[in-house]
Amino acid sequence: MCDEDVAALVVDNGSGMCKAGFAGDDAPRAVFPSIVGRPRHQGVMVGMGQKDSYVGDEAQSKRGILTLKYPIEHGIVTNWDDMEKIWHHTFYNELRVAPEEHPVLLTEAPLNPKANREKMTQIMFETFNTPAMYVAIQAVLSLYASGRTTGIVLDSGDGVTHTVPIYEGYALPHAIMRLDLAGRDLTDYLMKILTERGYSFTTTAEREIVRDIKEKLCYVALDFEQEMQTASTSSSLEKSYELPDGQVITIGNERFRCPEAMFQPSFLGMEAAGIHETTYNSIMKCDVDIRKDLYANTVLSGGSTMFPGIADRMQKEITALAPPTMKIKIIAPPERKYSVWIGGSILASLSTFQQMWISKQEYDESGPSIVHRKCF
């Protein structure tokens, strides 16, 4: 990589977490919650020099006095003022760089509305004065990070899950499937089933505790019915968890009932197909000649694919759906929580990519619609 001072910035804006850093690095420098918090009551903290908004970890730690909002819902930006605050925080507080000195690579959800990519482009050039920028599709970056250009990516984060078939580096839009079931829904579901056990979690602060329980103790069962059987007859699957106040709670079949909702959305009262069936449906929407390449290169990406056991279960479920002789391979890279960011870091540091950037000059000549001609 050339000198740090001209390194491109890579910013992956997820519904739950924002990942940011420098192209050429192997991991993001900054990872913080995609939250903007505003004081619930004006002037509670007298003389504290109260700010009118807080971003990320600071918003998280002051959540008791704030109203927290997520500007990215289901992977798509819905509140641009708050989004701008997150980007500002990313550049100036987290990375401590001047955005007008660095090209910026942003990521977007598959099937992101055209107006949204234009708005991102406009904010980068007009608010932050970046010299150059690019918008890449998250799933495509994850595939690059796994060293492939053809495959199907199951990307599941905090706010949305997508299955994205990619051929020779291009996403196939007609076959992309979206499932509005992801980490946040699983956390909510775990809150609900723990309440049935007699533990009460209701506030946004308590939701964070439940998210931690989910991340530390949940796993995907290979055979759900059999696992339920085991859980009801022995205590071998029980684990204990200490709450911040010192109380210890025990969690049993909830450990695998929670992520099971990804395979059986009916648990959440949803009509949708599970992630295995959605992946299969995506593959079946593709040309018959490329299907075997997709089955053999099914890549998991995003934080909600981090549950132990998920790859084996996917293998089993897809095998049951696919033609009998088909070779099926589920790739679950250990760094998949950050593979979108890593793919962006790889892409932005390639010498061949340098002519792909949208420059400030091109933007000034063509306006925001330039993004559709240069980023696809």
Swiss-Prot record:
The modification N-acetylaspartate is found at residue 3. Pfam families: Actin. The modification Methionine (R)-sulfoxide is found at residues 45, 48. Its main location: cytoplasm. The modification Tele-methylhistidine is found at residue 74. PANTHER family: ACTIN. This is Actin, cytoplasmic. Keywords: Acetylation, ATP-binding, Cytoplasm, Cytoskeleton, Hydrolase, Methylation, Nucleotide-binding, Oxidation. It is found in: Cytoplasm, Cytoskeleton. Its EC number is 3.6.4.-. Oxidation of Met-45 and Met-48 by MICALs (MICAL1, MICAL2 or MICAL3) to form methionine sulfoxide promotes actin filament depolymerization. MICAL1 and MICAL2 produce the (R)-S-oxide form. The (R)-S-oxide form is reverted by MSRB1 and MSRB2, which promotes actin repolymerization. Monomethylation at Lys-85 (K85me1) regulates actin-myosin interaction and actomyosin-dependent processes. Demethylation by ALKBH4 is required for maintaining actomyosin dynamics supporting normal cleavage furrow ingression during cytokinesis and cell migration. GO terms for cellular component: cytoplasm; cytoskeleton. The modification N-acetylcysteine is found at residue 2. It catalyses: ATP + H2O = ADP + phosphate + H(+). The modification N6-methyllysine is found at residue 85. Actins are highly conserved proteins that are involved in various types of cell motility and are ubiquitously expressed in all eukaryotic cells. GO terms for molecular function: ATP binding; hydrolase activity. It comes from Biomphalaria tenagophila (Bloodfluke planorb). SUPFAM superfamilies: Actin-like ATPase domain (SSF53067). Belongs to the actin family.
